[in-house]
């Protein structure tokens, strides 16, 4: 029940373009229940307070919206659900590191052991690991069993990149200078797991895209654009979440660390103007993805067509997940419906501005059009 002393925050998000239908996987309850069992087994729900934090991640519902196709293998969906429960916790811990005086030594040591477990789970005796690292061992072993060596290698590479990007983000915000949106965006493309999600989507998709197609610049541009749409959704909804948290007495660091807040601090404008700018970036990126997708369809293999269909579902499902997930409506796990989001979903067609790159580090995506 919502704390009566807390007035719900009304947070309006500008119109967001999404031409894809919404759906949810029929096994959503199973994914959630088994995911919570996984986290409980590995010691993350030892107290009621811990259990509330984990449950609030809502990973089962997120995965069910990302991948609604009932034909997707449930064991793969479950592995991704368990992965999200654990790694959302790790992702949230970066803010504690940013606000501490310990620097990067702790995260580097933690990430190094994680990477070794992901790379060679069979080289470690599970019974000799603590519960936390047993969870990593479990995920790494299941991933290797459930997919091809090629897909597993792609996943490991992306996990490595995600860890390195988290270290870069921690270092960026631990510096004393004012962080600029232009610095933050290229790092956030990786830390929000956009590139990791490219390979997670490939893991879920039963077909394996041939290497020459997979590594083509146009396919990578389309995949990165699709997942960056999810990045912008995250930044828009996280802006509301962070605004609510900063209004609480327990808020730590009040420096902006979200794309919306960074743009607002950089321009001196209003929150509404910064939200509108990020929403426009997002909508233009949707349009870029659609244009690249249309061009790829002409020569795509059946496996690539299946993968593009997965991307469509993730774009739509991610928007729905943010609009419904307790992770965003209940920021601390103790105040259900603390934030009342009012998003506007539209299927209106793209504007001409959609063909203009939005930032130099990702301009190469637009360069793949008509190539």
Swiss-Prot record:
Q: Name one GO molecular function term.
A: terpene synthase activity
The Swiss-Prot or TrEMBL record lists the needed cofactor(s) as:
Mg(2+)
Q: Where does Mg(2+) bind?
A: 234, 238, 242
InterPro entries, alphabetized:
Isoprenoid_synthase_dom_sf (IPR008949), Terpene_cyclase-like_2 (IPR034686)
| Catalytic reactions on record | (2E,6E,10E)-geranylgeranyl diphosphate = cembrene C + diphosphate; (2E,6E,10E)-geranylgeranyl diphosphate + H2O = (R)-nephthenol + diphosphate
EC class of this enzyme? lyase
- Enzyme Commission numbers on file: 4.2.3.148, 4.2.3.149
Q: At the top level of its lineage, which domain of life is listed?
A: Bacteria
Q: Which UniProt keywords apply?
A: Lyase, Magnesium, Metal-binding
Summarize subunit and interaction data from the UniProt record for this chain. Homodimer.
Record function comment: Diterpene cyclases that can form multiple diterpene products.
Protein family membership = Belongs to the terpene synthase family.
Q: In its UniProt entry, what is this protein called? A: Diterpene cyclase DtcycA
């Amino acid at each position: 029940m919502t704390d009566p002393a807390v007035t719900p925050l009304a947070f309006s998000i500008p119109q967001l373009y999404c031409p894809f239908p919404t759906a949810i996987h029929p096994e959503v309850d199973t994914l959630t229940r088994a995911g919570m069992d996984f986290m409980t087994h590995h010691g993350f729900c030892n107290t009621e307070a811990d259990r509330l934090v984990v449950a609030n991640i809502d990973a089962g519902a997120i995965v069910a919206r990302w991948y609604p196709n009932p034909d997707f293998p449930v064991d793969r969906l479950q592995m991704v659900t368990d992965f999200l429960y654990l790694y959302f916790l790790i992702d949230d811990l970066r803010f504690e590191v940013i606000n501490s005086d310990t620097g990067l030594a702790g995260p580097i040591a933690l990430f190094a052991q994680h990477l070794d477990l992901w790379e060679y789970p069979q080289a470690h005796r599970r019974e000799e690991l603590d519960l936390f690292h047993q969870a990593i061992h479990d995920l790494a072993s299941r991933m290797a069993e459930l997919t091809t060596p090629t897909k597993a290698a792609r996943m490991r590479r992306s996990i490595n990149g995600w860890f390195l990007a988290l270290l870069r983000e921690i270092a960026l915000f631990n510096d004393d200078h004012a962080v600029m949106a232009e610095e933050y965006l290229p790092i956030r493309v990786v830390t929000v797991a956009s590139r990791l999600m490219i390979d997670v989507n490939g893991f879920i998709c039963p077909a394996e895209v041939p290497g020459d197609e997979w590594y083509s610049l146009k396919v990578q541009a389309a995949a990165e654009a699709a997942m960056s749409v999810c990045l912008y959704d995250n930044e828009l909804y996280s802006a509301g979440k962070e605004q609510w948290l900063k209004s609480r007495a327990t808020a730590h660091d009040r420096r902006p660390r979200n794309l919306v807040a960074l743009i607002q601090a950089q321009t001196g404008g209003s929150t509404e103007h910064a939200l509108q700018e990020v929403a426009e970036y997002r909508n233009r990126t949707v349009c870029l993805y659609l244009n690249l997708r249309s061009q790829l369809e002409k020569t795509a293999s059946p496996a690539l067509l299946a993968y593009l269909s997965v991307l469509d579902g993730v774009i739509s499902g991610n928007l729905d997940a943010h609009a419904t997930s307790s992770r965003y409506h209940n920021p601390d796990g103790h105040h259900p419906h603390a934030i009342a989001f009012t998003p506007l979903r539209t299927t209106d067609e793209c504007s001409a501005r959609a063909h203009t790159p939005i930032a130099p580090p990702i301009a190469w995506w637009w360069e793949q059009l008509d190539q």
